[in-house]
Amino acid sequence: MGFKNVNNLEDDDDENYVGEDSNILNILDRIDTNISLAKNNIIQPLKTSKGDNKVEKPTDDGSNEEIKVPSSVYKKPDEPPLTTISSMYSTNTTSKPIPPNNNNNNNNNNSKITKLISNKKTETSTTKTETSNTNINPNSPPSVHGTKLIDLD
């Protein structure tokens, strides 16, 4: 583990840690120094009653000085976006219903599905008591009776 002379922390720019962890400790020391410098010189925006854009900057004597910042530099936060993540997942009651598709293809498809279902019902009712596959019509498609085609030759 590295060590450092702690008696003189004010002027530690020229001092470095020594030892096996010296690189990490030197980096952490620089980060800590930068954070403390940033805390002392930070400019924080203030809201005033007039709505002016003013910031408070610490001065050398410890007091704070208010500085007016042009609106081109300091922008007030805009309105929140209209589309947020929570609104994307919420149900929208004002949306228009989707109109039904009036294609003839849909009607034909629905009637074909109905015919297949009715064919399947009749086919299963006739073959329900029989155990052999020889009575199944080989000309019917496999989707109707749910079995594989058998080569009878």
Curated annotation (Swiss-Prot):
Spans annotated as Disordered: 43-153
Biased composition (Basic and acidic residues): 49-68
Bias (Low complexity) ranges: 91-138
The protein's name in its UniProt record: Uncharacterized protein DDB_G0285189
Protein source organism: Dictyostelium discoideum
